[in-house]
């Protein structure tokens, strides 16, 4: 099956690591395994079948915890969609499923490097994100 889109570029649009002070770092270092990874995907048309797809990862503690660090990345993919794609569902699948599945290994590597370089080495995400499954759940 041929793909009905092509990723013509990827870049880090925004990346953030926030640990406000030393007591917070010491607290977070012991609690970071309880942090949750959240994902958000949004897109916008650029021009002539080109779409900007932003995949956002946020790694943080529960809102009520006062001593916490926050990590976030917005990874942008520039996608050229085949002109034959006119169905809204097909476009949605490209944006929410196909592109994220393709770029996720690089995005995860970059994000884990951010965590390591921020003083929190050895973090691993328990399971790989299955964007196909998330897309199917969303459709139901």
Swiss-Prot record:
Organism: Pelagibacter ubique (strain HTCC1062)
Protein name, as recorded: Putative protein-export protein SecB
GO biological process: protein tetramerization; protein transport
Transmembrane segments: none
Annotated Pfam families: SecB
Location in or out of the cell: Cytoplasm
The protein's role, per its UniProt record: One of the proteins required for the normal export of preproteins out of the cell cytoplasm. It is a molecular chaperone that binds to a subset of precursor proteins, maintaining them in a translocation-competent state. It also specifically binds to its receptor SecA.
GO molecular function: unfolded protein binding
InterPro entries: SecB, SecB-like_sf
Quaternary structure (record): Homotetramer, a dimer of dimers. One homotetramer interacts with 1 SecA dimer.
This protein's UniProt keywords: Chaperone, Cytoplasm, Protein transport, Translocation, Transport
Family note: Belongs to the SecB family.
Principal subcellular localisation of the protein: cytoplasm
């Amino acid at each position: 099956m041929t793909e009905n889109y092509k990723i013509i570029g990827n870049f880090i649009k925004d990346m953030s690591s926030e640990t406000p002070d030393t007591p917070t770092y010491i607290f977070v270092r012991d609690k970071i395994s309880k942090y949750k990874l959240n994902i958000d995907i949004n897109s916008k048309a650029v021009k002539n079948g080109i779409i900007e797809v932003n995949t956002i990862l946020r790694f943080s503690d529960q809102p009520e915890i006062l001593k916490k660090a926050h990590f976030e990345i917005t990874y942008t993919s520039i996608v050229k969609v085949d002109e034959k794609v006119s169905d809204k569902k097909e476009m949605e699948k490209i944006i929410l499923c196909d592109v994220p599945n393709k770029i996720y290994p690089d995005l995860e590597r970059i994000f884990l490097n951010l965590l390591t370089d921020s003083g929190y080495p050895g973090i691993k995400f328990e399971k790989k994100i299955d964007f196909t499954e998330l897309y199917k759940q969303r459709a139901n």
